[in-house]
């Protein structure tokens, strides 16, 4: 599988040695700038459509991604909106062994809102299970 090595996106990858595959990654629709005024460099996000029990890659049912960084938080929500994602499952703690593993991209309290991309995100149900 061909990785996205030629794109200058190092600041968008949580792990420099784990890249998205070109043929299955969502490509963010280009925009002149983000709502916060920052320019959009390219359509890259470290995520891939994956096979799942509901269908093949062609059906675009499941997206796997790295936990968003603080600087990719808006790109993450941009992908969610663009791809009409209806459920998000996070399988890591925000921090593990003192290191950030995922920027908190949702409001920490159910019912609260957090501005994201071109919308306000509201937490409906937050369930935390211990990770061993």
Residue map of PLM features:
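Cys-based phosphatases of the PTP/DUSP/CDC25 superfamily and their flanking regulatory architecture
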Residues: 1-132
């Amino acid at each position: 599988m061909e990785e996205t090595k030629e794109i200058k996106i190092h600041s968008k990858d949580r792990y420099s040695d784990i890249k998205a595959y070109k043929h299955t990654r969502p490509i963010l629709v280009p925009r002149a700038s983000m709502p916060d005024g920052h320019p959009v460099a390219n359509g890259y996000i470290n995520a891939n459509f994956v096979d799942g029990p509901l269908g093949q890659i062609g059906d675009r049912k499941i997206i796997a991604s790295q936990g968003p960084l603080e600087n990719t938080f808006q790109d993450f929500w941009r992908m969610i909106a663009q791809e009409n994602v209806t459920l998000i499952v996070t399988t890591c703690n925000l921090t593990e062994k003192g290191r950030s593993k995922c920027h908190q991209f949702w409001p920490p309290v159910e019912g609260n809102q957090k501005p994201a991309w071109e919308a306000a995100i509201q937490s409906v149900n937050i369930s935390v299970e211990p990770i061993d």
